[in-house]
Design a protein with these regions (language model features):
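Conserved catalytic-loop position in the HRD/HxD motif
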Residues: 58
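Helical "lid/coupling" subdomains associated with nucleotide-phosphate turnover
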Residues: 3-53, 68-71, 76-188
Length: 188
């Protein structure tokens, strides 16, 4: 299956034809809604059910999916074209990033995902479930291990641990991030 990057590519048809021609694969391009649904099903394989309303976040390159779930059901889902590859291409950011740029990005994501924030407030969500490589990288930095060294099904990241990594990343240059224990080079 193909997701956001192919969904919105100008050369989508040519790309899919070439891929099929060279590999023999028939690739189905799924909607953002279907992507969110599959993410939810994958999370349920890992945690079985939510003890309280929770929001799932998948940070992708082309899109971010947010799914509000409770028990074993999703209540609401969205897919927005706010993935990190798109953000990097859209905004010119300093190295290290400046405080004003952080605020600009916070405003951008808040506006793009305002419906998600509203739904989370309505359901009094207190738990974020991350299910992408970005969250694996945060966990690897916290655990001070090399990327892929630890295979995890789940891992709780405490808020203070997250903010410690967050502050470190904000203050660091690209070169410094490349040498951080746990940092996956594709996430620098």
């Amino acid at each position: 299956i193909a997701t956001s990057a192919v969904r919105t590519a100008e050369n989508k048809i040519e790309f899919l034809e070439k891929l099929s021609e060279q590999s023999g694969w028939i690739v189905k391009v799924i909607t953002g809604e279907k992507e969110a649904e599959l993410i939810f099903k994958g999370v349920l394989l890992a945690i079985e059910k939510f003890e309280q309303p929770s929001v799932i976040l998948d940070i992708g390159g082309g899109s971010n999916e947010l799914i509000l779930g409770d028990k074993k059901e999703w209540l609401w889902k969205e897919s927005q074209p706010t993935g990190m590859a798109r953000v990097i291409n859209r905004f010119s950011l300093s190295d290290p990033i400046h405080k004003g740029e952080v605020k600009m990005l916070q405003d951008y994501f808040t506006e793009a995902h305002k419906n998600a924030f509203t739904k989370c407030k309505e359901k009094e969500v207190k738990t974020l479930i991350g299910c992408s490589g970005a969250f694996d990288t945060i966990a690897d930095i916290i655990d001070s291990i090399n990327p892929g060294e630890k295979q995890r099904r789940t891992q709780v990241i405490k808020l203070d641990e997250f903010y410690k990594v967050y502050e470190t990343l904000l203050k660091s240059t690209r070169e410094e991030r490349l040498t951080m224990k746990g940092m996956d080079f594709v996430r620098v």
